[in-house]
Amino acid sequence: GKFREPVIRITNWARAFGATSQSGKYVFVSTASNIDLSQAPLTSPSVFNFWRPGYTPPNSTQLGQHNLVAPEFQIIDEVTAPAYVNLIQETVQNGIGWAAEGFTGHDVRAAYSAEIAIADNASALVDRLNRLLFYGQMSTTLRDRIIAGVNAVPIPAVTGSNQAAIDSAKLTRARTAIFFAMISPEYLVQR
């Protein structure tokens, strides 16, 4: 498979979930730091993109034995791997980018309306993510694990006065499913 570039992952999130800008300006902070994505659009240091074209990851016996290269893996290390998990958690939860003048919080956010609408049905929610993010290629094992994670977030029974708690639980279930999907190895390595 091919390792998805970090900027492509954020772009997938924005497209899949209809992320929009509060200000209309799409105010993004630089994502080039190794505690963000280690990559920023239009800042490639060479015509070969962000990585050396002949790079083979250390200890990758399968690639080495077959004389293959995987330049996109050069961006992964012990700092960037957890940094992506932290960034995607923040992005799914609160959005991404700077607060534009006159606004609070991250500028680019997703409402997750379609996901919230089906959040009471974990299977339907994960099937939707399978279509949006995995192009129908999610394994049964990953699907079952994400469903279990979503079902770990209970939705309160309707009492007539707790709609806010129900809505909050559905939003949490949607965000949980998206987060688990986007940090999974199956999502990170496109097949």
Residue ranges of model-derived segments:
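Flexible, low-complexity segments enriched for small/polar residues
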Residues: G1-R191
